[in-house]
From Swiss-Prot:
It is an enzyme of class 4 (lyase). This is GTP 3',8-cyclase. Pfam families: Mob_synth_C, Radical_SAM. It comes from the Bacteria. Its cofactor is [4Fe-4S] cluster. The lineage of its organism: Bacteria, Bacillati, Cyanobacteriota, Cyanophyceae, Oscillatoriophycideae.
Length: 329
């Protein structure tokens, strides 16, 4: 297994979209109160006194939608300036990004991943559950703003859902032709969305690659921070294509990350919520950071076994108790 040096930090469980694969229609969510979320100070304490001393060097801010987090820019600036932080990135839906892109860039945010599941405004609005208001144009303006201020690499994440947006794979791949953009196709997976998954299932990454290969050809490539993605490019294109194949091609041996939820639960494996640790309660009950660090180190030492032997036993009930929006993706 790779060294675990990457922490995904959910800043908030709320989102201004309600994407069907992330927050299913039937989901009844109880959002966290502000007091139930980790504060900026608590996040910084955990990074500075627990995770960085344990070798974590790369951090990604997620949600929900992280741009909804109050005092976001000062938090980004504080994390970016912590000794030991080598890379700070964010995943966002870009709806509020146009007005924040420059400030985030100036604060020290290195990279952005942006969810863009369709280039068709009607399909896009259907996927995000727009509730009567079209949001495609403002999202696209956010992506353009991120490009203008200099975020590089700029990655676009596409969750491919059969019969919904899979017919756009070639159009989305074409975005990489004349831009230094990196489009990543993600296999749809069943976490908190069993009904939609059972209705739609998923398309293997290799099938998507075959479609692209048949039109333009494909060659292997590299991009910074590729994580579990397999990277290719269309010959002559400026950008790249990534394929995240968590359903068809197990990549547990390449896993280098843990996840911290907005309410302080540390999750060593996306597919396993039975092995979580409540760091917020430890902090708020006065447990010294050195003891929290020792507990996290013990969980870190168990991660290979959790990944390989327990990924199919990731819940105690057979169903995940949290949606992707609550986990932080």
């Amino acid at each position: 297994m790779n060294p675990v040096d990457y922490l995904r930090i959910s800043l908030i469980d709320r989102c201004n979209f309600r994407c069907h694969y992330c927050v299913p229609d039937e989901a009844s969510l109880q959002y966290l109160l502000t007091s139930e979320q980790l504060s900026n100070g608590e996040i910084l304490t955990l990074l500075e006194q627990v995770f960085i001393p344990l070798g974590f060097r790369k951090f990604r801010l997620t949600g929900g939608e992280p741009l909804l987090r109050p005092q976001l820019v000062p938090l980004v600036r504080a994390i970016a300036h912590l000794p030991g932080v080598e890379d700070l990135s964010m995943t966002t839906n870009a709806y509020l990004l146009a007005d924040l892109a420059q400030d985030l860039y100036n604060a020290g945010l290195n990279r952005l991943n942006i969810s863009l599941d369709s280039l068709n405004p009607e399909t896009f609005d259907q996927i995000i559950g727009n509730r009567g208001k079209s949001r495609w144009q403002q999202t696209w303006e956010g992506i353009q703003a991120a490009h203008r201020v200099g975020f590089d690499p700029l990655k676009l994440n596409v969750v491919v859902i059969p019969g919904v947006n899979d017919q756009e794979v070639l159009d989305l791949a074409a975005l990489t032709g004349d831009r230094h953009w990196h489009v990543r196709f993600i296999e749809f997976m069943p976490i908190g969305n069993d009904k939609l998954f059972n209705e739609r299932a998923w398309i293997p990454s290799e099938e998507l690659r075959q479609r692209i290969r048949a039109k333009w050809g494909l060659e292997t490539a590299f991009v910074q921070g590729n994580g579990p993605a397999d990277i290719f490019k269309i010959p002559g294109a400026k950008g790249t294509l990534g394929f995240i194949s968590q359903m068809s091609e197990c990549f547990c041996d390449r896993c280098n990350r843990m996840r911290l939820s907005a309410d302080g639960w540390l999750r060593p494996c996306l597919l396993n919520e039975a092995a979580q640790m409540d760091l917020k309660t430890l902090l708020r009950t006065g447990v010294p950071p050195r003891e929290i660090r020792a507990a996290v180190k013990a969980l870190l030492d168990q991660k290979p076994e959790i990944n390989f032997k327990m990924r199919d036993m990731g819940t105690t009930t057979g169903q995940y108790g949290r949606t992707m929006s609550q986990i932080g993706g």
